[in-house]
């Protein structure tokens, strides 16, 4: 060793049912009237003993959202509706609104004129003429006058095309802009950092400006009626099938994303999901299932093809790959209640996929131990531009309804589209597992079913971390922060995180003797909160950093201390600043508090850092681009194979060098920082383990070590490891899906060695490296 102290690695193993994560351990606290989930925040006890301020040697986190914009569209009103389409009898539409099916539809369903096979599939929408085949239709035909003085006119237009065609006019002379987004500085743990943050206009919440700046006025709609959010020319599947419900209630961002999907202006790079299974060639035959590279066991399912087939044959979809029977529910323990599989239309009269209002924020767990999934789903609803990446808005219980839905998840570096039918497990006519507080809203129950299919069964979802679900729903990289032992310059790190689009959650340790103990200051112990904004304002005692925090309950249970609703501190803030902040004092569960009070009251924080691919896709979907930096990220895949590359941790010096090794070149220090250090996050994720739970395989303890390689460009040897201590490493090896560590180090040439704790433990893994500057990496 470089000094006389031997480097010893620690191992920690926890029971799978304790994998509830920072927010996961108290995620059941989002529930109004039910208690759910197994307890135990595994990192609660580990943070003080091992992490000392963040995974793998300390460090801070990212943050959530673009900053606020200065520019924007002004008032706007007085639009004149254009002529309706020509494909239907106008008077009949007025006499019988039940037959208003978004333009022309099947002739034999509503008795409209035209050719059954062609003309009536398309038709005109509410704002234009049209024509076309299976979803064509005209848009445009309406005029906006004086929308903030920025838009002069919109044209009309016809249209057509197959299934997702669309007509539409255009906007003329769209002026104005989004204004400047915030700048920012650094942060971290290793000898400080941070500083030089421009705090004056820092607004939190990812792309809060999108809803104000895009909406109907700033987007050229081709495939969606901007007034209703309906798909122009869509088939009224609810009339055909008899089990449909109400239209979705989409906000501005949802309408924009839906139109981009329908009109073909934006296409996500998503693969059909194929269920993995053990590979008999790698030990899945006589020696048991293999954790390495499971092979596909099902055929790819194309949502649009399957839906079209069902609509054509007038039948409801039944998924042959995830049957409505016990095989989809469990692999070891049968549910205590008798289960009946029902479609939403058999549960309630008017099912709706997505409703408006607070009900979308109130997700109830049910009787499955997946509170970690509930917390992630509730967090996702706060950001429409992320929510609709997982819950595509091109599906509903009205338009094209055929009992088939799809959801999109991130799986080990790629996005997959999971197709399901809408038969849900119920008991006595009520949903058995996760569901929305509103009894006619079904996105959360269907999302949970798709997630269960992703991993094989509902039982496979028992025990997990919120970070695992957040990553699967965003593709981000998650960190844990112990606020009792915080990293240095945490405030600057949070500001930088908000600028870079990260998501924040926080909590207070639960009182084991009191369920959701309400404190005198209005906060609730053992409850999950989301941090949605950050701002520097002039307070009674000078400039003050305040945080906007949301209670997912969305009710009057709020912080009542300084900077709370209508507190005296707000008297020192100019009205213009309050207006710019969008400040409102409602009993909506959202409140502000000072950073100092936040640190005094909250104990844990979880950060999901969004990579450049996510931020780029948000830009493509919405047209809003972050003015500040985004993370630079590199990803590598590898495997620990028995007697080859599964060398175990540094404790096993004779085999440690056999592990996969990756060279990482960090060349840039953090911008605007004077200490010449760079922020870097390492994350090692083991693949497929949840899929293999039914075969008796669970997570193995994993971790990593990072060495300063100097001028060495090749693999490091046993002799090197014996003589040199690691420059960075995970503080312990834990049987979690992913181990993460944030560090601030000098730029240089480093070698990362991910490993299991014990030698010859097999698993496949993914290594991710995030940094603020240029990064170069390769496997050695």
Curated annotation (Swiss-Prot):
Q: Which PANTHER family match?
A: CALPAIN, CALPAIN CLP-1
Which one Pfam family would you cite for this protein? Calpain_III
Cross-referenced InterPro entries: C2_III, Calpain_cysteine_protease, Calpain_domain_III, Calpain_III, Calpain_III_sf, Papain-like_cys_pep_sf, Pept_cys_AS, Peptidase_C2_calpain_cat
Region (Disordered) location: 269-300
* Official protein name in the record: Calpain clp-1
Q: In the UniProt entry, which residues are flagged as the active site? A: 371, 527, 551
- Alphabetically ordered keywords of this record: Cytoplasm, Hydrolase, Protease, Thiol protease
Tell me where it resides: Cytoplasm, Myofibril, Sarcomere, M line; Cytoplasm, Myofibril, Sarcomere
